[in-house]
Structures are given as C-alpha cells and as structure tokens.
Amino acid sequence: MEKISRKKGSSYHRRHHVALVFQNYNLIDYLTPLENVRLVNKNADRKILSELGLDEKQINRNVLQLSGGQQQRVAIARALVSEAPIILADEPTGNLDEETAKDIIAILKRMSLDRQKCVIVVTHSKEVAQASDVVLELKKQQLKEKKK
C-alpha cells in the first residue's frame, strides 16, 4: 500500500485513500439511497444496493423512510463504491439490533473482500471484534494485538 501524505493541504489525497462509515450514517436526508451512493461515485448503479439487501422500493424512497439497518447498508455502499482502498468504520453496528448487526458485519466483510478493500472497524462490541481477522486493543494508551 502506498504511503499517505500527512502534509498540510493533502486532505484531498487522504479522502481518496480512506472511505468512512459513521455510526450515525451521515446520509443526505433528502436524497434516495441511490442518489446518496452516487455522491461518491456517479457511475454507481443499483446493483450495489441490491447486493446489500435493499429492494427496488427501498432504493427509490427517501433515506429517512428506511430503518437504521437499511440506512447503514446505504452508508456501507457509499464506502464500497468509492475508489478508496481503505474503509474506516466507526461503530458500524452501534445503533443496530443484534441480528441486523451480524448481517451488516457479514456483508461488510464479504463485500470488502470482493472489492479488495482493507476495512478497519472501531468497536466496543466483542461480537464485531470476533468477526475480524486481526484485533487490536487500545488499553491505557497502549495498542496491542489481541489473540483470538
């Protein structure tokens, strides 16, 4: 992986290397899921949203009419269609019920492998951590690899 510049003024460069998935989704509330995804990649099609479990009706409605799990799927779709090789997901299942959370993690893992993206997840959930390939634990300002 190429080095990402830390120089002042290089935020454009960093934005194209890291896609973010927030706990609170950060969707544009007056747009549809497809329009939200196309903000990141104007060539994105409905297929990505279908692969993430949204049906045609959900894809065409306002994002505020979707459940939390459906909105999180839209946020993940935005990250997946970006050109960024790294996805940083901050508590991507924090607002979701256990079943939806499991679905989201499985989808994120499968689709990131399909699209060759590195996913870094920040979480307090043991279940989410257990689904990861590598777990790093931050404790008392020390970062250590945790054995699974």
What is each model feature region?
Residues 1-19:
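ABC ATPase NBD coupling module
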Residues 6, 48-64:
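Conserved ABC nucleotide-binding domain
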Residues 62-66, 70-72:
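Conserved ABC ATPase signature
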Residues 76:
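Hydrophobic anchor residue at the start of the ABC signature
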Residues 83:
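Conserved catalytic motifs of ABC-family nucleotide-binding domains
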Residues 87-90:
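Catalytic Walker B motif of ABC-type/P-loop ATPase nucleotide-binding domains
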Residues 98-100:
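Helix N-cap at the start of a conserved alpha-helix in ABC-type nucleotide-binding domains
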